[in-house]
Amino acid sequence: MGQRRIKIRLSESSVRNAINELNQYKEEIQSKAQEYVNRLSEIGIQTAKGNVGNFGRYIVFSKEIDPNKYGCKAIILATETGKIVSKWQTKDGINSVDVSPLLMAEFGSGHRAQNPENVPGVGQGTFPGQEHAEDPSGWYWKDLDGNLHHSYGVTPTMPMYKALVEMETNAMKIAKEVFG
């Protein structure tokens, strides 16, 4: 976009022309702001889609773009298409819990989910009622056929966090491309 100069003389028609040029410039900036947030949000969505691990079929990413008088705002949304029903056997019978694929992808569970990126304020993901989440030895569980399995938990793939990092990394580059 570069610098724009508006020349004005002290006449009614010159002032009117300057106002028209300013309004046109305002629309141009608004359009560029929309392009900017659209491109950044697309980078975020593509990054998030590439970091969902085995939960990809349960998570849909989209964006909402809201142009307003102050510029433009974009929000990236991660929506679940459903819950995963996890079932296992215990001495008391079959247990079941609905698991959020979105939370599992973002935060993981168990010992493997100890905030691998050291994101401030993010704790270790756990299953509801988990007793062994912080046990470095992991835990054992029986499937519905009675077979014993060992687990350390689910490693988080952090799709939304990685989307944020990628957008931050590209913010200046995209701004230069869009605004010049």
Put a short name on every predicted segment:
Residues I84-W88:
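Mid-chain, well-packed structural core segment of small domains
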Residues M1-K83, R112-G180:
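Short, Lys/Arg-rich flexible segments
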Residues K91-N95:
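"Short basic amphipathic alpha-helical interaction patches in structured regions
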